UniProtKB/Swiss-Prot annotation:
Residues 43-54 have a biased composition (Gly residues). Keywords: Calmodulin-binding, Cell projection, Coiled coil, Cytoplasm, Membrane, Phosphoprotein, Repeat, Synapse, WD repeat. PANTHER family: STRIATIN, STRIATIN-4. GO terms for molecular function: armadillo repeat domain binding; calmodulin binding; protein phosphatase 2A binding; protein-containing complex binding; protein-macromolecule adaptor activity. Residues 69-136 form a coiled coil. This is Striatin-4. Residues 165-182 are annotated as: Calmodulin-binding. Residues 7-35 have a biased composition (Low complexity). It is found in: Cytoplasm; Membrane; Cell projection, Dendritic spine. Mainly expressed in brain but is also expressed at low levels in the kidney. GO terms for cellular component: cytoplasm; dendritic spine; FAR/SIN/STRIPAK complex; GABA-ergic synapse; glutamatergic synapse; membrane. Belongs to the WD repeat striatin family. Calmodulin-binding scaffolding protein which is the center of the striatin-interacting phosphatase and kinase (STRIPAK) complexes. STRIPAK complexes have critical roles in protein (de)phosphorylation and are regulators of multiple signaling pathways including Hippo, MAPK, nuclear receptor and cytoskeleton remodeling. Different types of STRIPAK complexes are involved in a variety of biological processes such as cell growth, differentiation, apoptosis, metabolism and immune regulation.
Length: 760
């Protein structure tokens, strides 16, 4: 439409610049400052475009090409703005629809998963019950037990029967079994709809039923209030008041009053029943097995018999809606017939349902139940009101909708609180990380003394007493045997030491590694490609250079990526700091010069202060050194109350000023680098603690000992969370080294049995 109007305007301007008629576009110059109406008797009439003579005053201004272009631009801008607004609204609505669809799909998936899980748990519960029955009675639950007790009935004299058919547990099992079969044939949702429909119809006609029902003999007729009983809540209150008045008139009014109120509000009893634990359930099973002697004459039913009869009637009434599903709301309610019609109808329904349950048990393999007709005619239930139906089934349905909107979840059972608390504790334990062996490294010929992980790849470097270092690519694992740990072959062997290799550490970015041995030398190695062929020729460029200066075996190495410095401790009694990247003399400083603390055993850089290094000694001392000052800064209190014990390894916490030491006296001590005080001390193993490693996040500590065990400790509460037996003893030695991967969920251990193991 806009294009037609613009074309008409251009045509009229090109022809004779006639005034704007009624059939043309509005004057674009109307937006000019002189926007007031033109002087004259009035605006242009309807006949302005039909050839009528103009008025005595001047007409509208003639059209011009700039005005037409301005009008077109204005209309185009308005159209684009509306289009953008429409697109934004459309995108917003599409996003909302997509969000709602995704939420609905997620809820359906969650419901399906929960149903599957609960079905699995119910199946496991059935298996456990069968196992318990076999352990207690020595026989399996089979169909051969169905007629075991039928021959024991005696026709003359008192009758013996097993009270199995009326117990709440039996009816509960029957309900669950019938619900399962109904769900398999696809009647679950339909049945729930019918039940909700009938509940609404009953509540809607409550006033009519109250007026039509016959009053109970001996009880006053209840007259409706001024407002009538319009809701389910008023109906329930009215029914409870009538029942209290009826029960108060009898002999045992006080006893029956309490029972009647509880029966009238059955969900209180259900809560107690659901909260019973497994021991109570087992007691009820034993109670069902007890034989009760019934005299030939009819007895007054006790409270327990009434409860059992109530449960049986509830079970029958539970399935009354199956027959009323086709009739709809207008079908007669079987519950009304029990009190207004034939009194034997309840008995016939109960016998019919027991026959159905017996047939289903033949198919499902459930234990048989003995059916004995009750003595005498069943009495009317004391808690049935004048309406003729029981409220046991419908009370929970009227509260918040009940089962109406549950769908597939309607047939699920609820566990008691004790089982729930156990499940919560078990779920907490399930979240704890459990380390399991994944790789076994078998290529060394003697004990492995040290380990070092690659910083970013799944690779491990081992140093052994056989004089070699070996590089392992853990991504190239092969399975040697079925159900066995994966074996890994080394991709490269480093050979240059003249004697056992005692220490190894990774350099910056894992491009270089450094090893120290019994030959008093420190070798710098270039890490080869992890995807190299293990059978390639020897590459002499792998050995970078040698750091010399120590006079005895090098027992410990540590590298600081921050300061690019290498620290070493030797049996000659010194700790040296090296610059491994220097081409000239690379030893920067040496301490202690006097050897007052003895022979160092381990060295480590502190994580919080890169310019500080901590060293441990055989004398049990732990000294903190300042690299900038080149002197001892602080002596930590690492000696225990029982006397000095050799420290085998010292490590630093990755995020706190904390030093951790492993001692020969089976202890682990935590020391504060700021004060030098001992923060915590504990006995960690059954033998000497030989090695330590802290994970990069500072959550747990791993320790190894000569008692052949690895233990993982929580650094929050200093408790052991896992113990692993991974190595065997050799010459009274077991585990020599442990390590944690800097960036992956891998830990490793090495021992005197020439094996290294990796855990995930």
């Amino acid at each position: 439409m806009m294009e037609e109007r613009a074309a008409a305007a251009v045509a009229s301007a090109a022809s004779s610049c006639r005034p704007l008629g009624s059939g043309t576009a509005p004057n674009p110059t109307a937006a000019a400052p002189a926007s007031s109406p033109a002087p004259g008797p009035g605006p242009v009439g309807k006949g302005g475009g039909g050839g009528g003579s103009p008025g005595p005053t001047a007409g509208p201004e003639p059209l011009s090409l700039p005005g037409i272009l301005h009008f077109i631009q204005h209309e185009w801008a308005r159209f684009e703005a509306e289009k953008a607004r429409w697109e934004a609204e459309r995108a917003e609505l599409q996003a909302q629809v997509a969000f709602l669809q995704g939420e609905r799909k997620g809820q359906e998936n969650l419901k399906t998963d929960l149903v599957r899980r609960i079905k699995m748990l119910e199946y496991a519960l059935k298996q456990e019950r069968a196992k318990y029955h076999k352990l207690k009675f020595g026989t399996d639950l089979n169909q051969g037990e169905k007629k075991t007790d039928l021959s024991e009935q005696v026709s003359n004299g008192p009758v013996e029967s097993v009270t199995l058919e009326n117990s709440p547990l039996v009816w509960k099992e029957g309900r669950q079994l019938l619900r399962q079969y109904l769900e398999e044939v696809g009647y679950t949702d339909t049945i729930l709809d019918m039940r909700s429909k009938r509940v609404r119809s009953l509540l809607g006609r409550s006033l009519e039923l109250n007026g039509a029902g016959e009053p109970v003999e001996g009880a006053p007729r209840a007259s409706p209030g001024p407002g009538g009983l319009s809701g389910g809540e008023s109906l329930l209150v009215k029914q409870i008041e009538e029942q209290i008045k009826r029960n108060a008139a009898g002999k045992d009014g006080k006893e029956r009053l309490g029972g009647s109120v509880l029966e009238q509000i059955p969900f209180l009893q259900n809560c107690e029943d659901e909260d019973s634990d497994e021991d109570d359930e087992l007691d009820s099973v034993q109670h069902k097995k007890q034989r009760v002697r019934l005299p030939s004459k009819a007895l007054v039913p006790e409270m327990e018999d009434e409860d059992e009869e109530d449960d049986s009637e509830d079970a029958i009434n539970e399935f009354d809606f199956l027959g009323s599903g086709e009739d709809g709301e207008g079908s007669p309610d079987p519950r009304r017939c029990t009190s207004e019609g034939n009194p034997h109808e309840l008995e016939s329904r109960r016998v019919k349902l027991q026959g159905i349950l017996a047939d289903l048990r033949d198919v499902d393999g459930l234990p048989p139940k003995v059916t004995v007709p009750p003595p005498g005619t069943p009495q009317p239930r004391p808690h049935e009101g004048s309406f003729g139906f029981s409220s046991d089934v419908f009370i929970m349905d009227t509260i918040g909708g009940g089962e109406v909107s549950l769908g597939d979840l309607a047939d699920l059972t609820v566990t008691n609180d004790n089982d729930l608390s156990c499940d919560l504790s078990d779920s907490k334990d399930a979240f704890k990380k459990t380390w399991n062996p994944k790789f076994t490294l078998r290529s060394h010929y003697d004990g492995i003394r040290s380990l070092a992980f690659h910083h970013s790849q799944s690779a491990l470097l081992t140093a052994s007493e056989d004089g070699t270092l070996k590089l392992w690519n853990l991504q190239k694992a092969v399975t040697a045997k079925k159900n066995a740990a994966l074996d890994v072959e080394p991709i490269h062997a480093f050979r240059a030491h003249r004697g056992p290799v005692l220490a190894v550490t990774m350099g910056s970015n894992s491009e270089y590694c450094y090893s120290g041995g019994a030959d008093a030398r420190i070798h710098s190695w270039k890490i080869p490609d992890l995807n190299m062929d293990p059978y390639d020729g020897y590459d002499p460029s792998v050995l970078s250079h040698v750091l010399e200066g120590h006079g005895d075996a090098v027992w410990g190495l540590a590298f600081s990526p921050t300061s690019q410095r290498l620290a070493s401790c030797s049996a000659d009694g010194t700790v040296r700091i090296w610059d491994p990247s220097s081409s000239g003399p690379s030893c920067l400083c040496t301490f202690p010069m006097d050897g007052e603390h003895g022979i160092p055993t381990s060295v480590a850089f502190t994580s919080t202060e890169p310019a500080h290094v901590v060293a441990s000694f055989r004398s049990g001392d732990t000294v903190l050194y300042d690299l900038e000052a080149g002197s001892a800064l602080l002596t930590l209190e690492s000696r225990g109350s029982s006397g000095p014990a050799q420290i085998n390894q010292v490590v630093s916490h990755p995020s706190q000023p904390l030093t951790i030491t492993a001692h020969d006296d089976r202890g682990i001590r935590f020391l504060d680098n700021r004060t030098g005080k001992s923060v915590h001390s504990m006995v960690a193993h059954l033998d000497a603690v030989t090695c330590l490693a802290v994970d990069p996040n500072g959550v747990f500590l791993m320790s190894g000992s000569h008692d052949c065990s690895l233990r993982l400790w929580s650094l929050d509460n200093k408790t052991c969370v896992q113990e692993i037996t991974a190595h065997r003893k050799k010459h009274e030695e077991a585990i020599h080294a442990v390590a944690c991967h800097p960036s992956k969920a891998l830990i490793a251990s090495a021992g005197a049995d020439a094996l290294a193991k990796v855990f995930v």
